[in-house]
Amino acid sequence: MDEYDLGIGVAPGSSSKAIVESYETPALNENECKPWLRKMWCIQKITPEYRKRMYRLLGLYKKDYDSLHPLVCMDEKSKQLLEDNRHPIVARPGSLEKYDYEYKRKGTCNIFVAIAPKAGMRYTKVTDTRKKRDFAYFILDLVEKHFPEAEYIQLVMDNLNTHFEGSLIETFGEQKTKELMRKLRFIYTPKHASWLNMAEIEINIMDRQCTGTRIESKENLSVTLEKWTEDRNENKCTIEWKFTRQHADKKLSKHYVA
């Protein structure tokens, strides 16, 4: 390399190699710097109301299952229906299934999931929409179909704008809602803390085992989901919650505010 390629002079007896090295950009260590990766994390100041709700949930999660007052966690998620443009090539010994990246959008539907984590029972339902009416009828199923013998259900939910008593009143009227609410205790996660709802864990498992693939119709989704739900219930698949109040105070106390 010419000694003046960098636009600077070189003192007699010095090495142009040293100058070149000093102007080279250090190589990025592929194990240390991955600028294309990002992590989403939402942790706000934890108010007394946040802590009150969190402590209540963590206390309930420690208790044994009570069939008269079952603890049930509920959540919902949208599912995009997709149809393959071309038939996939089925898997064979030594060869994975192959499918084309192109697909047709066939609309969306909604999946309700409720789980009694200590009992190992879950209940799912597919609806066309995620409106107040859909929520109300899923709650009706929980009370009258799935837990008819319970004195009341302790129902854990997030703060979605349909997850309130008003949805029941709008759908069934005040008298029927009063009857239902005598058998319900709504328990809400803190805002921005849906991770405290064990139904999210069940939905993640559902996506990995059942609904994470392309499904082209509501009917096929309902059949597939019903079979998965039955298998999980037959095996009494429970969720063991390990995060305690002590863990919360240790990990989150720096965010606590008075």
Question: Where do the model's predicted regions map?
Answer:
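A short, amphipathic alpha-helix used for macromolecular contacts
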Residues: 1-20, 64
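Extended, low-complexity cationic-aromatic segments
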Residues: 6, 10, 54-133, 137-140, ...
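Major-groove recognition helix of helix-turn-helix-like DNA-binding domains
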Residues: 20-33
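C-terminal domain-tail junction helix/linker
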Residues: 45, 85, 220-258
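RNase H-like polynucleotidyl transferase catalytic core
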Residues: 98-103, 176-198, 214-215
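Short, basic/hydrophobic alpha-helical segments
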Residues: 134-154
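Acidic/histidine-rich, metal-coordinating catalytic segments
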Residues: 150-164
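Active-site proximal helix-loop segment of RNase H-like, two-metal nucleases, encompassing DDE(D)
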Residues: 191, 199-218, 231-233
